[in-house]
Amino acid sequence: GLVVSSVVGMFEHVVAELTIVMCFQSLILDMAGNVGTQSLAVTIRVLMDENLTAGQKVHLVFKEARVGLSNGLILGMMSIILIGCYIYFFKSGSLQFAFAVSGCIGAALILAMLISSLVGTLIPMFFHKIHIDPAVASGPLITTVNDLVAVVTYYGLAWFFLIEILHY
């Protein structure tokens, strides 16, 4: 919690310039957490039920990454459209601003969900490799890592695209 709060504090200037991005922080964090936890559960189940070869582990990583990317693309595209319309119609922003912000949110969702699915797969594999029960050790770590990934992805994209490139 303290580490994630410190990282959010590093992006204070982004929130000060674009307060609207704060409204959608929980969307990014929650979806990244959901995807990471799902990948974690699938991976732990597979690791406990089967003796996997290196090739099967690589296949599992790519499978979970595809799932995370697919879900991210679907939710990211929906977010671009729905949040863009919401900002435009209810927050009285220009059309360009509304869809720039929603595009940033959509991109952050795609990236955060992809990275979180990879992290949710790789962390239990690491613990399994070093003979620590991944079911016990992975939970707290995956939550913190996914929150960090989501915060850095979201506010990093907001800073880079919305402030540095588009100058909002």
Task: Describe each PLM feature range.
Residues 1-118, 122-134, 144, 157-168:
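Alpha-helical transmembrane segments and their membrane-interface boundaries
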Residues 143-154:
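Alpha-helical transmembrane segments that form the membrane-embedded catalytic/substrate-binding core
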